[in-house]
Amino acid sequence: MKTIHVSVVTPDGPVYEDDVEMVSVKAKSGELGILPGHIPLVAPLEISAARLKKGGKTQYIAFSGGFLEVRPDNVTILAQAAERAEDIDVLRAKARKSGRTPLQSQQDDIDFKRAELALKRAMNRLSVAEMK
């Protein structure tokens, strides 16, 4: 079966690099499925997970938004932060998730938005960690 090369990169360095059969991500415009030979594309990404299918198995990588660049023979995900499912610290993610209470009592819009984004990132990391 044909494959496409995938690189997931953060400011701290590469998180994932391999050849896969299919990549699925959630872009701002909706869900994208990328196969080898896909037309060139650049898209902003939501806080979500990339699903990478190879040899009948699926790997998951949580990322906190970013950009997707697609070329016919490779896919690059540029993210501020990204973690493979097996690398996620579940206790740390749960601690962030339990920070929901300040979200309900905050009056300041900036603090509310920051808390909301932190909650989304934590929930995304937990859902990806459970997919191991």
From Swiss-Prot:
Which CDD domains does this UniProt record tie to the protein? F1-ATPase_delta
Q: What is its main location?
A: membrane
Q: Where in the cell is it found?
A: Cell membrane
UniProt protein name: ATP synthase epsilon chain
> Which Gene3D superfamilies does the entry link to?
ATP synthase delta/epsilon subunit, C-terminal domain, F0F1 ATP synthase delta/epsilon subunit, N-terminal
Q: Does the keyword Transport apply?
A: yes
Q: Which domain of life is it from?
A: Bacteria
What membrane topology is given? Peripheral membrane protein
A cellular component term, taken from the record's GO annotations:
proton-transporting ATP synthase complex
Q: Point out the gene that encodes the protein.
A: atpC
User: Which family is it part of?
Assistant: Belongs to the ATPase epsilon chain family.
State the function annotated in the UniProt record.
Answer: Produces ATP from ADP in the presence of a proton gradient across the membrane.
